[in-house]
């Protein structure tokens, strides 16, 4: 699996498309509602290309639910990076 991460509008999807295969984009949105992040990471690792937007930089949200969602997204990204054959960070 190729894992591509980076900020919004950094060209992740454009970079990913030529690789073909099964692709899933913006997986950070799945993390907040996941019962088990390791199980979700295992499921997503079955794709050929996975992209996630980095949400951990910048202003920390006041809302606890938004902070928890960002934390979950970051932990999911770490799990995906550990399972990936290759990780690409876009800037």
Name these PLM-found stretches.
Residues 18, 23-47, 55:
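Conserved inter-motif catalytic segment of the P-loop NTP-binding fold
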Residues 1-21, 25:
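Glycine-rich P-loop/Walker A and Walker A-like loops and their local beta1-loop-alpha1 context
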């Amino acid at each position: 699996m190729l894992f591509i991460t980076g900020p919004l509008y950094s060209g992740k999807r454009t970079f990913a498309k030529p690789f073909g295969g099964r692709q899933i984009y913006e997986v950070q949105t799945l993390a907040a509602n996941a019962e088990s992040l390791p199980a979700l990471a295992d499921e997503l690792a079955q794709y050929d290309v996975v992209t996630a937007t980095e949400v951990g930089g910048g202003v920390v949200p006041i809302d606890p639910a938004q902070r928890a969602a960002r934390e979950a997204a970051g932990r999911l990204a770490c799990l995906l990076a550990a399972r990936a054959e290759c990780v690409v960070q876009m800037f």
